Structures are given as C-alpha cells and as structure tokens.
Amino acid sequence: LAAALRISPVLANLLVQRGIDTVEKAEKFFKPSLADLHDPFLMKDMEKAVERVEQAVANQEKIMVYGDYDVDGCTAVALVYKFLRQIGHKNLMFYIPDRYTEGYGISIKGIDLAARKGVGLIIALDCGIKATEKVVYAKTKGVDFIICDHHLPAEEIPKAVAVLDPKRVDCSYPFDELSGCGVGVKLCLLYTSDAADEL
C-alpha cells in the first residue's frame, strides 16, 4: 500500500488500521466525492425536518439557529445560518449559549430570547437530544424545535418536530459517528445541489 500510493509506511499502517486496506479504498479516501455520501433521508425524521424548514422559509418565519459553544456547535451554527441565507431566508438569528452561565445544551434563557424575538422555529445543532423538558417548555411559548444532534439519546426522545440523530436506536442511517455539524450538513444537502456545492 505504501509503495503503490507513494506514502510512508507509518501512514499506510494507519490507513490499514482504519479499514482502508486496498489502493481503491485509499484513493476513495483521499479523493472523496459528494456522490459517496449516504442518502440523508435514511436518517429518522429527516422528511419532517425538511418539511418544517421549507414551511418556515416559505412563510418568512423567524428561525433561530442554536448551537453549543464548542467547535462542533459553532461550525454547525455557521454552516446552517449561512446556508439559510444563501437560499434566500433573511429572517434569521443565531444563538450560542454562554459557557459559564448556561453551560452546554439548550437553555431556558435561549428559549425565552427566541420567544421574545418572535422566533417560530429553533434548529438546535450539536445539542438537544436530552432536552425533553426544554422542548416542551418551548412549545408553550409557541416555538418549534428541530434537533440535529449526534450524542447518545436518553430513553425518551424529545417531542420536537424532528429529532435527527444517527445514534437513535430507531435510526437506520448507516454511519452513526457523524458530528453535530455533519448532521446539519445532511439537512442542508436536501435543498439544492448548487447551494450544497458552496458549503
């Protein structure tokens, strides 16, 4: 493998340890294509998520893009926010919770801000899979949730409009190690190939 690819034996060994043990697999690994990605609709609730986002965009409903303050959460928020702007939705805001006063995950403070600002939909990225009570609280304020997470769920899944998480036991998506941002990418990829190319 090292000789065929003209790479160091150390790198070749790392590839083999990760199941990339042929030249064909290595070439695919080093030159990935969008065509190699799994169908986003294999993820549980994806159709519901797409329908709700389309409804919000069509009605110019205010959307809050919400994510944790770590790298995964921030990149997910940046990506989904930019994507929604690219498809023409301008009635947007984003929210990253304060790490010291709110901590990780969905916060009551963030939900209250969304309600005050007239937000009808929160897209939560890299968080929310265990926010059962907070999703119920948001609903009492007239705010819907789409959760795009990758953490292990608890026994009870939040009663959001859609809960996208490849680690759900009832999810048939073939790769359950996506990041939170990766789940957000899957949601965005369903709109237009032109916009997806620019991600």
Which stretches of residues belong to each language-model region?
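Single conserved hydrophobic/aromatic residue that forms the stacking wall/gate
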Residues: Y191-L199
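Short beta-alpha connecting loops at secondary-structure transitions
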Residues: L164-F175
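Active-site/ligand-binding-proximal alpha/beta "capping" segment
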Residues: K186, L190
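Short alpha-helical "patches" and their helix-cap loops
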Residues: K25-L34, Y69, F94, D98-R99, ...
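N-terminal small/polar loop signature for handling phosphorylated ligands or for N-terminal nucleophile
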Residues: K44-I157, V163-L164
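Cofactor-/ligand-binding subdomain signature composed of acidic, glycine-rich
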Residues: L1-N59
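A generic alpha-helix surface/boundary motif
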Residues: P9-V10, A78, G182
